[in-house]
Amino acid sequence: MQDKIRTLESVVKELLSGNKDTACNLIQREYPFEKFEVFHRTYTLKQKMKQFKADGFIDRYSGDKLINLGILKVLSFYFPEEFPYHPHGKMTEGHIAYWELFPTIDHIVPIAIGGRDEPDNWATTSMLNNAVKSNWSLEQLRWSLYPAGDFNEWDGLTKLFVMLVENDELLLKDNYIKSWYNASLDILKM
């Protein structure tokens, strides 16, 4: 980052000396604008669960444990006032656990700066860290990638979620819970 500051300082000094062409050449050579092709992002629930399993329900940016989203939704089903859910993640309307513990897929190299939407560029992270990271690279944030966890050691409460649903099949009337239940069964079979 300091090299970039020195480059811009040199550019400003060249401008002050009336050397606009030299300043422009400095920018082009030392701190050029890079236009990246943006690729469409898309993944299925099955792909998400496969990634969460591969990462052992560990937030790859913090090393923290995350949990199967189905658990959160079941808690909201049973306790809508105490553990509210908002379908669009509105922080003022939903429990903070949906941000802190809800796993999502992030692109290690952001799509906005040329990263690809492919599994080798995916990492499990919390919604909160995903929002913080946004379109920034790990280097820009001075973050590092933590090792994946072991699904056999931490399954994100997936087995407990399946047991909970099978203990109260009324939960399957909620389409969201039903989707996560089916996806959970799939990854437990893998």
Regions found by a protein language model. Give the residues of each.
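Short flanking/linker segments adjacent to small metal-binding domains or redox-active Cys/His motifs
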Residues: 163-190
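Short helix/strand-bridging catalytic loops that position acidic/His residues to coordinate divalent metals
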Residues: 36-40, 109-113, 145
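A contiguous, mid-protein "functional segment" used to position or interact
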Residues: 134-165
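Short cysteine-rich loop/turn motifs with clustered Cys
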Residues: 45-102, 126
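A boundary/linker detector
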Residues: 1-50, 54-56, 63-69
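Short Cys/His-centered divalent metal-binding micro-motifs
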Residues: 67-68, 118, 122-144
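Alpha-helix boundary/N-cap detector
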Residues: 2-6, 148, 152, 175
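Short beta-strand-alpha-helix junction that forms the catalytic/metal-binding core
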Residues: 56-59, 98-106, 110-131
